[in-house]
Amino acid sequence: MESLVTLYQEHIKTLQQRAQQVLARHSLDAMLIHSGELLTVFLDDHTYPFKVNPQFKAWVPVTQVPNCWLWIDGVNKPKLWFYSPVDYWHDVEPLPQSFWTGEIDIVPLKNADDIARLLPTQRQNVAYIGPVPARATQLGFNTEAINPPGVIDFLHYHRAYKTGYELYCLRQAQVIAVTGHRAAKEAFKSRLSEFDINVAYLSATGHRDTDVPYGNIIALNEHAAVLHYTKLDQQPPEKRRSFLIDAGAEYQGYAADLTRSYAASEGSDYAQLIKDMNKEELELIATMKTGVRYTEYHQQMHYRIASLLLKHQLVNGLTAEAMVKENLTGPFMPHGIGHSLGLQVHDVAGFMQDDRGTHLAAPQQYPYLRCTRVLEPGMVLTIEPGIYFIDSLLAPWRAGKFSQYFDWAKIDELKAYGGIRIEDNVVIHKNSVENMTRDLHLA
């Protein structure tokens, strides 16, 4: 395997080529990419946890340091002004010395405001890429040069194609997340509360709750019916029935996003539903290949969901085709089959069909699908089918013309389990699909 240094060198070479293309297209001399700034809580002297600009960490794995700047012209070595003040109140990151620093010209920035005099004076044909437009204005950028849509679209579109370095980071994020998932499963078996299961996960991954790429979903019993449940009860339920964990990790700025569902009793109907869903999810992934639009796999999964509902007699008397046509599967799986994954959990440009920003929306029947791209080598996506028992979504069907086909007694019994979601992270290769999650034997 190539060394991390070599992988990063090739990564920077690719980013420099992309920079040359986008700068030439928009008649620009350079991009100034801002890591971001700390945001102060209203009427307080505390700040919110820092979240770095994703376009910044695409170039350098600096994720915890505000007030940093990158000057990119596509030709010369990228220049990084690294914020390293004299400060006895807070921890200060030293100037980095790592696998990546040989490819970057690093200059210390002692005072955040010094950047105004350190930047090249000629900024007329430079684009500011960052989260603080007011700072860009102070530095003399006009409105058209602040996050210009054409530049952003180009950068976003090409982020779908991961470099070898990015794939390495994504695989490492998987390793960390899988470690956490195994610890969380053991905590569930030990009858711990949602709060304590989350503590076990964070401890195993070495993350703080502000470091994980998204808020961990640790849902026991009926809480699994809340798609983004993040409350974390501090007391365990009187009776354990189910556990849904949707939790990720981050490595050098790249995310993992994994979900598993577990039954407290292996002999329950719910446990069998998990096994059958797991089988359908793996079979769907086995069909994935380049040249097929991601939307197709979402639609295929709805046919598989229909078959599961029929097999478990939650719906009766209809064909799978009729169920999908009439959207009877919709209330059971109300979200998309997945999304792009990378520097962000819901990575950008899922609807973008070219690097000029052409948009293809999700089908009207499936408005929450987050990706309509045609699969190509280098893309990384999640596959995360689910079946849930959500009162607000099932209520119209209970009163509707298809009500007779639902076994409401069985559905009501399963409501106490909340739902099921199983999520793997996959890489599209030219002639194969790599399941990063299953390669680490997370059942």
Curated annotation (Swiss-Prot):
PROSITE patterns hit by this protein: PROLINE_PEPTIDASE
Q: What is its EC number?
A: 3.4.13.9
- Keyword Aminoacyl-tRNA synthetase part of the UniProt annotation: no
Q: Which UniProt keywords apply?
A: Dipeptidase, Hydrolase, Manganese, Metal-binding, Metalloprotease, Protease
Q: Give GO cellular component annotations, separated by semicolons.
A: cytosol
Q: Which cofactor does it need?
A: Mn(2+)
Q: Which InterPro entries match?
A: Creatin/AminoP/Spt16_N, Creatinase/aminopeptidase-like, PepQ_N, Pept_M24, Peptidase_M24B_aminopep-P_CS, X-Pro_dipept-like, X_Pro_dipept
User: Which reaction equation describes what this protein catalyses?
Assistant: Xaa-L-Pro dipeptide + H2O = an L-alpha-amino acid + L-proline
Can you tell me where the transmembrane regions are?
none
Q: Where does Mn(2+) 1 bind?
A: D257, H339, E384, E423
Q: How is the cofactor bound?
A: Binds 2 manganese ions per subunit.
Biological processes per GO annotation: proteolysis
Record GO terms (molecular function): aminopeptidase activity; metal ion binding; metalloexopeptidase activity; phosphoric triester hydrolase activity; proline dipeptidase activity
**List of residues binding Mn(2+) 2:** D246, D257, E423
| Family note | Belongs to the peptidase M24B family. Bacterial-type prolidase subfamily.
Per the entry, what this protein does is: Splits dipeptides with a prolyl residue in the C-terminal position.
Q: PANTHER family under this entry?
A: XAA-PRO AMINOPEPTIDASE 3, XAA-PRO DIPEPTIDASE
What is the name of the protein in this document? Xaa-Pro dipeptidase
| Organism the protein comes from | Erwinia tasmaniensis (strain DSM 17950 / CFBP 7177 / CIP 109463 / NCPPB 4357 / Et1/99)
Top-down, what is the taxonomic lineage of the species of origin? Bacteria, Pseudomonadati, Pseudomonadota, Gammaproteobacteria, Enterobacterales
Please name the gene that encodes this protein.
Answer: pepQ
